[in-house]
Amino acid sequence: MANQMLAEVQKALQDNTPQAEDRLALPDVLVTTAACLGIAIVAAVPGWIYLSGSFALYLALIIGLMFFGIYVARRSPVSAPLALVYSAALGLMMGAFSHMAVGQGGNVALITQAIIGTFAGVIGMLAVYSTSWGKKASRANKLFAGLAIGYLVLGLANIVAVLFGVGGGWGFYGVSGIGLVLCALGVALAAWSLLIDIGRADQAIQGGAPRSWSWSLGMSLASSIVWLYMELLRFLSIANR
């Protein structure tokens, strides 16, 4: 999604340079990111209540989100309604996952720790991006895409492992020895995804992209933040079993 979106932004700039009042600004990205995160958090409540008790519904939501994400990635730019609907679906999954994660460990305080860790991760990635190394890492899209696809395949295989009771209900993540390593890999990839999204937003703003791209960037940033939260929560839940 990141590579295609950045290419579309660059194409839009080449085809038609927007007027100054129609150019993307930092407040535009902040507002859309906050809106997408807010919708996701609100949607997490029914996800926590209604979806966590049925693994079949949760699995259906994951599959639906995958196809929804592919559809959204092909839209350029993403409209506000589409970004908010996608964020709501992501929030449902976040709520269901959160309930199941603390259910495994029985410690709701882990959610607070994961939220604090997510805030720290966002601040940390902003600090990393301010360095020359961080800017280079944010442009390593092809390497990230390859690793992300591999991690997605692992996630699909892990669903099968969960169905067979591997790792005490956590799949490969719950296997002693490699479980925490896989969790740490997930946290690292989510943080890298956030770094790439920060870089794309900065490039779009500096390049004078049209304001219509604010929802695409905000949705992408919010998705990476939610992903980072979920990976941190999984790491904490398994580490505290």
Segment roles from a protein language model:
Residues M1-R241:
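A hydrophobic alpha-helical transmembrane-helix feature that marks the membrane cores
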